[in-house]
Structures are given as C-alpha cells and as structure tokens.
Amino acid sequence: MKKIFVKPRELVVPGTLLAQGPFKNGRGTFREGNAIYSTVIGLVEIRGNVIRVIPLEGPYIPEVGDNVLGKIVDVKFSSWTVDIGAPYQASLRVQDAVEERIDLLKTDLRKIFDIGDIIYAKVKAFNEVNQIDLTTKGMPFKGGPLRGGQLVTITPSKVPRLIGKGGSMINMIKTLTGTRIIVGQNGWVWVSGKNDELERLAIEAILKVDRESHTQGLTDRVKEFLLSRLRELKEQGVIEEIPEVNGEEGGEDDGQA
C-alpha cells in the first residue's frame, strides 16, 4: 500500500506519520517498517519519491541534489572549501568545477574561485561522516563567481514560500524590482539590481516573506508593499515606469528562480 498522509509545506511534529509504502525517507524523518515518520518540528517537502521535513529552526542540513549558494573560505591544492551555512563546511573539487583537465602544478585555483567569491552549486554527496561535496557543473552562470549584488540569508524552511507556487512569489519580486535573484535551498539569496534603491527594495520584500511566511494573504501584501514603494520611487524620479506582470501592475508570473 502506497499512501501519503500529509501535504507539502504542512507543519508536522516529531512522530507524525508522513507516508506508507515504497517512499525514500530524507532528512528529518525515520522509517519504521513500512511507515515514515517525522523526527523534527518542521515543514514537509515531497520531491518525487523522497519525503523529508525541513526544520523550522536550526542550521541548514544538506540533502543530495540541493542547489545552494556558498562562499569560498579557503583555496587548497586541488579543491576549495565552501561555507554553505551548514554545521560543516563543504568541499568543491577541481574536477567538479571545470570541464577541462588542468595541470594543478601550473594552475592557480584562485583565478577560478578565490576566497570571498560567491558560487552557485549543487550538493553532490553528503555522507555519514558529514563530508559535503559540491559541484558547479551544469549550474546556471557556470556556478559563478557571482559578481556584485548582495547576499541575504533567510530561514531555510522559508525557501519554498519565497519561491512560491510555480515560482510566483520570487518572479513577482524579480519582475517588479527588475533584479536578478538566485535562491539557494540553504536559505542564502543573491540579489543584484539595476540600482541601489531597487536592489534594497527586493531585499526588503525577501525579508518580509521570511518574517511573515506563516501568515495568510502574504502574496497580496508583498505585492502591495512593492507597488507602494515603486510609486514613491517613480515620484522621486528614481524609476520612469512601474513594471507590469501578466498585463497588470503587480500580477503574478510563473517560473522558477
């Protein structure tokens, strides 16, 4: 028998029965016989055949396949050490960052990624000894480094709310502010705007989602917040027009950040 007893983004407590059947239990869950239960207070996430629970509080716990933003904190002979906001630092090996073979004796890895650089990577492996391996191969922007912009952190469990159904929330913020935004599943968000005011406005909207993610009508409130601030910026001459989404001010758009 295959059955799921909870909905995506449902708040659960330890011991909650999540599913029965041939599902794979991810982080924040445990299996007992044919059943999968929650081990933490958090929000349910269902990806294909994998069920996990994202804790409401605490540091980011990696899951293989997660797309994350990270900061280079050390450059070694054949790899980089990366901070992704997890309890343990991650590692990015040369072969997981570049397509071509390189001579490590003749190559300064700092010319690829240097300390302080922000990268966009995928969690390739996470084992029982807490070794986290990343890869930037196949990632947008070739994994980075991401130039300019600002890095904002939100609670990892709030990431699905920031993205919204079908990407609706994050795309509304991106369209109305004209900013480039990359959301990592570790709760790190990179924001790059056309000017400081629009970049700051996008960040304020992101932090508003983080603070109010548990409330009803959040999309409408964020939309009205953005439109109100954009009208002020237009009056001040900072912007010429207020962008349209789906043909009207502040409408929703679909897509993934």
UniProtKB/Swiss-Prot annotation:
Database matches in Gene3D superfamilies: 2.40.50.100, K Homology domain, type 1 (3.30.1370.10), Nucleic acid-binding proteins (2.40.50.140)
Signal peptide from the UniProt entry: none
Residue pairs linked by disulfide bridges in the UniProt entry: none
Keyword terms of this UniProt record: Cytoplasm, Exosome, RNA-binding
One Pfam family cited in the UniProt record for this chain: KH_6
Molecular-function GO term, any one: poly(A) binding
Alphabetized InterPro entries for the sequence: Exosome_RNA_bind1/RRP40/RRP4, KH_dom, KH_dom_type_1, KH_dom_type_1_sf, NA-bd_OB-fold, Rrp4, RRP4_N, RRP4_S1
Subcellular location: Cytoplasm
Record's keyword annotation contains Cytoplasm: yes
Disulfide bond listed as a keyword: no
Domain S1 motif: from-to ranges: 65-137
Job of this protein: Non-catalytic component of the exosome, which is a complex involved in RNA degradation. Increases the RNA binding and the efficiency of RNA degradation. Confers strong poly(A) specificity to the exosome.
NCBIfam families, sorted: PRK04163.1-1
Name the record gives this protein: Exosome complex component Rrp4
Species for this entry: Thermococcus kodakarensis (strain ATCC BAA-918 / JCM 12380 / KOD1)
